[in-house]
Curated annotation (Swiss-Prot):
InterPro entries: P-loop_NTPase, Small_GTP-bd, Small_GTPase, Small_GTPase_Ras-type. This is Ras-related protein R-Ras. Its EC number is 3.6.5.2. It is an enzyme of class 3 (hydrolase). GO terms for cellular component: cytosol; plasma membrane. Residues 1-30 are annotated as: Disordered. The modification Cysteine methyl ester is found at C215. CDD domains: M_R_Ras_like. The gene is Rras. It catalyses: GTP + H2O = GDP + phosphate + H(+). One of its GO terms (molecular function) is GDP binding. NCBIfam families: small_GTP. It is found in: Cell membrane.
Amino acid sequence: MSSGAASGTGRGRPRGGGPGPRDPPPGETHKLVVVGGGGVGKSALTIQFIQSYFVSDYDPTIEDSYTKICTVDGIPARLDILDTAGQEEFGAMREQYMRAGNGFLLVFAINDRQSFNEVGKLFTQILRVKDRDDFPIVLVGNKADLENQRQVLRSEASSFSASHHMTYFEASAKLRLNVDEAFEQLVRAVRKYQEQELPPSPPSAPRKKDGGCPCVLL
């Protein structure tokens, strides 16, 4: 579970009340990036997670940043979340924010087949920019409240995520379904990845016995 304070810098978007990120608790800082095609609900998911508010109007994002201080699995963390553009005309900006991200929420809409096709390209681009075979990424099928308009089967998305070593959530920003869970799972994936990336600790030097230098008898 997570809890904590939040703030945002999105233009024309509601700002959360309460304390800001000026004095984060001791712990971790993770840069999370929300990516996906245009109109899939990236901003709605982000604002629902940050401010518990559903944005119903589609307002194309260029780039908005938010901060949330929360606790995941008992460990405090500051999450710097970047909500990115999905439109093709802003595609040149993608590599810049991909370089900075510690983890990615890869979003499509279950009622938009094209948006699902696009996540494969974004996944490949993330790994290329990071020069890694694996990276912390969580796949989210948003707009689960539009089941009667579904174009992407749950089994298809689950199979894709499993083959690419991602956790998959079907979420609804409108119903606040699996919103917190997706972000929390991404934090866990980032932690696990960073632990694996840490260099091994150097072997500790053997302790010398009291009584001076060791001697060799001839």
